């Protein structure tokens, strides 16, 4: 993880739209670009390749 907590929180505390992959605010109810309501939290750890 990053050594700067504020920067890490700013980058990782997001919701991702399952339809268009747009980044949304953490308190969003629907996507800012396409209006889709199925949002997931951004992954905090990288996936293994």
Curated annotation (Swiss-Prot):
Stored Gene3D superfamilies: 4.10.1060.50
Entry keyword set: Ribonucleoprotein, Ribosomal protein
One annotated GO molecular function: structural constituent of ribosome
SUPFAM superfamilies named in the record: Zn-binding ribosomal proteins
A GO biological process held by the record: translation
InterPro entries tied to this protein: Ribosomal_eL40_arc, Ribosomal_eL40_dom, Ribosomal_eL40_sf, Ribosomal_zn-bd
GO cellular component assignments: ribonucleoprotein complex; ribosome
Signal sequence range: none
Record PANTHER family: 50S RIBOSOMAL PROTEIN L40E, LARGE RIBOSOMAL SUBUNIT PROTEIN EL40
Family of this protein: Belongs to the eukaryotic ribosomal protein eL40 family.
HAMAP family cross-referenced by the UniProt entry: Ribosomal_eL40
Identification of the protein by name: Large ribosomal subunit protein eL40
């Amino acid at each position: 993880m990053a050594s700067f907590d504020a920067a890490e929180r700013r980058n990782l505390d997001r919701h991702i739209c399952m339809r268009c992959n747009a980044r949304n605010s953490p308190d969003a109810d629907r996507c800012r670009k396409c209006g889709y309501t199925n949002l997931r939290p951004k992954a905090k750890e990288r996936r293994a390749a």
